[in-house]
Amino acid sequence: GVGVAPMLPIVQALKAAGNRVITVLAGRNKDLIILEKEMRESSDEVIIMTDDGSYGRKGLVTEGVEEVIKREKVDKCFAIGPAIMMKFVCLLTKKYEIPTDVSLNTIMVDGTGMCGACRITVGGKTKFVCVDGPEFDGHQVDFDEMLKRMGAFKKIEREEMHKLQPECEATKEMDEKSRNAAWRQDLRKSMKPKERTAIPR
């Protein structure tokens, strides 16, 4: 799913350093499984899990991870994706005492730590994802606090997206008509390319 893109260079670097790499790709459905070919090229084994069973095996990422833990000696785990998924992977790996790195995707506004939107608690201390992370020891992250903070604007986001959608479609339709309006075509024909690019914008 969403964590595959940032995970790919990590997998490639681990493999290049001579590690045995087992990758568990997971998503809600087949359409959300991306970069499979690239992951296979840099992994010794790839397990694919989908929530609906439309591709690979039906189940959650934690099921695939636990299967690997039970049959292999796992020295390190990396988890990148939705916060809830990272939380449960970390709970699982903590049980087996496997160090786990996560890459957090909290709300970030200014990228300097000034706004505090990305504030989290790691090992009982306040950290800012934008300046202290985004990678952290997953066993130290207070995921419950993080999930609560990330959900603070969900209702407002849903309301705004609902308002925005019809407007976007209308704007797109209007833009298409406006872009190819007869008066614009006449103007384009009457001007040489250099004259068109010289118009102050």
Positions of PLM-derived features:
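Short C-terminal domain-edge/linker segments immediately following a structured domain
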Residues: 53-57, 77-80, 108-111, 131-134, ...
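Iron-sulfur (Fe-S) cluster-binding modules
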Residues: 15-21, 28, 35-45, 65-68, ...
